[in-house]
Amino acid sequence: MTMEEMKNEAEPNSIVSMTLYAVMYPVFNELGRINPSAAQTLRAAFVKAEKENPGLTQDIIMKILEKKNVEINFTESLLRMAADDVEEYLIKRPEQEFQDLNEKARALKHILSKIPDEINDRVRFLQTIKDIASAIKELLDTVNNVFRKYQYQNRRALEHQKKEFVKYSKSFSDTLKTYFKDGKAINVFISANRLIHQTNLILQTFKTVA
């Protein structure tokens, strides 16, 4: 996927902003141990800039890599890094159902992030696919469990995000079927990144309305 293709994705909280939390947030966290004030200021500036110009962080990173003549598969690298918890998305409520939601989302993202290491070993990759399917089901079961137990004024937003997650899960499944025909791993990486992004948006939506 080219930069322009990623930017043209018509979805809220666009996937191009994944670079902010997958790449830069860990940098801010490290800086925070040395200079908390500077880290906080820098984080706020990047968040504001990314909100106003989705994809800006990715543009900056790509320009730096280009200037340093570093050639990497950015989509693959992003997938490898995207499994880490993002504090801004984690649900703080102490009830077990919400902590289960955090845990199931974490498990799914972790399995998806292993795809680049598994995809060239057919046996291991087939097992990874089974693990992903199970993790998706467990996350959806947990979402439904929260729905049953808690009432929300903004239930429509939650239902919408759940439908988006299901849509991208099916898209990921379709991408896998195509991969076994054409062998294009990059499309699997792109689809996995989208699914991780939707997983984070589920957490974000629950955190916002919970």
Curated annotation (Swiss-Prot):
Keywords attached to this Swiss-Prot or TrEMBL record, sorted alphabetically, are: Angiogenesis, Apoptosis, Cell membrane, Cytoplasm, Golgi apparatus, Membrane
UniProt GO cellular component terms: FAR/SIN/STRIPAK complex; Golgi membrane; plasma membrane
Q: Which InterPro entries match?
A: PDC10_dimerisation_sf (IPR046409), PDCD10 (IPR009652), PDCD10_N (IPR048288)
Gene Ontology molecular-function annotations: protein kinase binding
Q: Does the keyword Cytoplasm apply?
A: yes
Keyword check for DNA-binding, yes or no: no
Chain segments annotated as coiled-coil in the UniProt record: none
How the protein sits in the membrane? Peripheral membrane protein
Q: What does the record note on quaternary structure?
A: Interacts (via C-terminus) with CCM2. Interacts (via N-terminus) with STK25 and STK26.
According to UniProt, the name of this protein is Programmed cell death protein 10-B
Q: Which organism is it from?
A: Danio rerio (Zebrafish)
